[in-house]
Amino acid sequence: SGAMSFAKELENGSAQFYQKLSERFTKEKDLFLSFAKENGDYITQIERAYYGVISDAIEGCFAFNIDPEKYSFKTELSEKTALTDALKRALEIEEKMITFYSDAAEQSKSLMADVPRAFKMVAKKRTLRKEKLSSLLAVKA
C-alpha cells in the first residue's frame, strides 16, 4: 500500500535524523539512538498488523487517502545547529508523525481492529517521545 510505503519513508527519515543527532550531541547519544531503533520497531509492528488483514482490505477495495505533503519534514541540520534547535526540529518531526499515524488510524477504522490499533499505538508512543523531547528542551533552553 502507498500508506505503508510512506510510513516506512517517514520512519526511515526520522531514524536517520536521530542517528545524526546521536553523532553530533554525544551527551544525549543513547536517547537519540534508542529513538532511531524504535522507528524500526514501529514499522515492524504496523506491517505485522496491516499485512495480517491485507487480503480483507483488498477484497473491500480499501485505500488510504494520504497527502504526503501534509506529513513531510526536513531532517537536515547545519553544522552550527544548537541542541535546542535540533530538539525543536525533533518535536516538529514527532508532531508530523503523530498526525500521520492518527490520520492513518482514522482512515483504517473500517479494517479489522488490529490495523487502526497499531497506528494508534505508534501515535501514542510518539506522543511519549515528544514529551521526553519537550522535557529535554526545557532543561537545555
Predicted segments, located by residue:
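Non-heme di-metal
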Residues: S1-A141
